[in-house]
Amino acid sequence: MEPSIVLAATPIGNDGDASPRLKQEIERADVIAAEDTRRFLTLAGRLGVEPSGRILSYYEHNEADRGPYLLELARTQRVLVVTDAGMPSVSDPGYRLVARARGAGVPVTVVPGPSAVLTALATSGLATDRFSFEGFAPRKGGERDRFLGALAGEPRTMVFFESPRRLPETLAAMVEAFGADREACVCRELTKTHEEVVRASLGELAGRFRADVLGEIAVVVAGADPLAADLGVAVEESLALEAAGLRLKDAAAHVAGRVGLRKKDVYEAAIARRG
């Protein structure tokens, strides 16, 4: 087979979703770069396929050293790249390997398949015409709040990953950043036996998921209403002008007039934001 790098999606919870092409690539690849070699071998066993190539680990903490090595191998061999679940390069260092390969003229091909991002988006019932994948929110409170705050005005549907242990505090932080009324969906254990999908407002979800849960989590959040997004920007500008020395009431009036909002709405929202 042609020397190249092959990115292949693996099941995110249901082995029945493994494609015939995935099984074929596992059997034929000269080298298999797996996020966790033991989990990969377990998956191959369940799928009834026997890898014929060398199996190497490839994950975030060895990517800097292993990536260039895999690229060199791909000049003369077929290198299959897989993660524990889903598509390599999504919340995964695989994209850097692809970037290097493209720059070096090494062929890259993709075996499509299961994706937690698209599965969560599809089952959420939220708008799919425009969306963004935001990965995991930062673990530390201050960094997480700034991360989410910067997305408060994002008009596209947003998809996040989260660990079961941090889900309660992340939902609470989303309530603060996006508002309790923003529609969202918590997706747990997608495609698995105990799959759970709960759509409600962020406030309701934060109340429901107060304790740690089990399983893989994706959270889908509706984009901001355009008017609310404009108001959020106006509030930030007003507070910035106040910090520069202008009275908040005057700052709100100035910004409201410029963007076409009611000065009362901007002023009251700025007071609420300031606390």
Per-region residue spans from a language model:
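Glycine-rich, flexible N-terminal cofactor/catalytic loop recognition
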Residues: 1-61
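A contiguous loop/helix-start segment that scaffolds small-molecule binding in enzyme catalytic cores
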Residues: 2, 78, 157, 161-275
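A short, charged helix-loop
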Residues: 5, 131-153
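Short active-site oxyanion
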Residues: 26-32, 105-109, 157-158
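General beta-strand structural signal in soluble alpha/beta enzymes
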Residues: 34, 83, 110-113, 160, ...
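Conserved helicase motor
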Residues: 56-64, 137-140
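Short amphipathic alpha-helix with an adjacent loop that forms part of the alpha/beta core around
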Residues: 67-75, 150, 210
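Short glycine-cluster motifs
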Residues: 75-138
